[in-house]
């Protein structure tokens, strides 16, 4: 039985992600979430108006839970390595077919397309915001650092590596941080 209030919402979102992983987008339904969560459909619809919004909220909660793992290591390079390590764990926590399934569904479902775009564009979900803010405060990065570019490049490189089946090992993360991200953050520092 799912608890009440915020705990209930968090539990429903965890179940929704579980159903999405198990069934894929096309077979995902509010009924399946309600059944697995031992909750009423009314409880779910009171919080999320449709399945696209529920999926967005579940992905938001998933990302936010991993972002909580990023802590201050005391330096920009080590903060970036810690952030990339977290992104690796986040990527490995989901099946590699999840996002391609959602992207295919976005082609013919405008509601889902809008929800996923809002999820991906939410600056509050960027794991790079806190480390870059700390770096600016420590004088390791300029106030004009392009946070969105750093996020986009890091996730694109990670996604590319996952798609090709290449290793997401510490060596790759170190090269990505040293040869790409730090160069973008501090041009001319090499």
Curated annotation (Swiss-Prot):
Any one Gene Ontology BP term: response to antibiotic
One Pfam family from the record: TetR_N
Residue ranges occupied by any HTH tetR-type domain in the UniProt entry: 6-66
GO molecular function: DNA-binding transcription factor activity; transcription cis-regulatory region binding
UniProt KW Zinc-finger keyword: no
Keywords in alphabetical order: Antibiotic resistance, DNA-binding, Repressor, Transcription, Transcription regulation
Induction section of the entry: Expression strongly increases after 30 minutes and then decreases over 3 hours in the presence of tetracycline; not under control of whiB7. Probably part of the TetR-TetX operon.
Residue range(s) of DNA binding per entry: 29-48
Record field: transmembrane: none
InterPro entries: DNA-bd_HTH_TetR-type_CS (IPR023772), Homeodomain-like_sf (IPR009057), HTH-type_TetR-like_transc_reg (IPR050109), HTH_TetR (IPR001647), Tet_transcr_reg_TetR-rel_C_sf (IPR036271), TetR_C (IPR011075)
Primary role: Binds to its own palindromic promoter and represses transcription of its operon; addition of tetracycline or doxycycline (but not tigecycline) interferes with DNA binding. Addition of TetX to the DNA-TetR-antibiotic complex restores DNA binding.
Subunit structure, interactors included: Homodimer.
PANTHER family: HTH-TYPE TRANSCRIPTIONAL REGULATOR RUTR (PTHR30055), TETR-FAMILY TRANSCRIPTIONAL REGULATOR (PTHR30055:SF148)
The protein's name in its UniProt record: DNA-binding transcriptional repressor TetR
Originating species: Mycobacteroides abscessus (strain ATCC 19977 / DSM 44196 / CCUG 20993 / CIP 104536 / JCM 13569 / NCTC 13031 / TMC 1543 / L948) (Mycobacterium abscessus)
